[in-house]
């Protein structure tokens, strides 16, 4: 057997790729490494100079993504020169690569000039038909989890003056680059759709909360929107109350309706919410479906399971 200290991620494990997958299971296709930026694959095992050729030696046939093109290519060449990648292993990988290309008729497409579809095909992205489909699907999945105090329906007649509290997410790291999120656009869309529905919306974020009694006189209800999202670089995504005005002190002062536009398990951070819904997505069609259902213009058709309560008794109340 293998000692625990010698266990490697699958991409670097010949006992899995070569012995089990290609040997015992008879897999005759192409094996591509995990993305070489992934910490689970390359973070804490052996130096990258050994990882790069080691992945091919272990049985992978293609290597996905560079850290540095020149350096990684040098690591691969050195692995071939020093025998880490044998001639037999190299030829096997090449045969599998060529075999996949042939199976996909890439040589024919190249000859015919049809490897890439025409740019005109991009015109369908964001077309009216796709937005219509998005709206139809959103109508089916927006879910009401609880409304213990019967705050709904949320109508202008009942709650004309809405205090909007918007909690956004973090920037995203994609292909090694930090990209800014689109929280401001999502927030602006929520405000626009609420105003179109007849509400007066206050989305200001003052430094101080101010007096409770004044808050209750100014607003009929609070709509707390959670659009918390990230990408891969975080192990856990939680609500971050970055300003006092956003912290959920208002839930016992005025009717507060909470809706998550992303993760469905946000009750772990707002267990005190009496009314909570999941919209799952933060695009305009999902926001529209959410508002329509909160207002009682459309029924909630989505379903939830016990995971939304995060295994905690207090989230159910």
List PLM regions with ranges:
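Short beta-strands and strand-loop turn motifs
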Residues: 1-2, 32-36, 225
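Active-site-proximal beta-alpha loop/turn segments in soluble metabolic enzymes
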Residues: 1-8, 118-124
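Preference for extracellular/luminal or secreted protein segments
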Residues: 13-14, 23-24, 43-317
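Catalytic metal-binding/acid-base residues of hydrolase active sites
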Residues: 36-37, 262
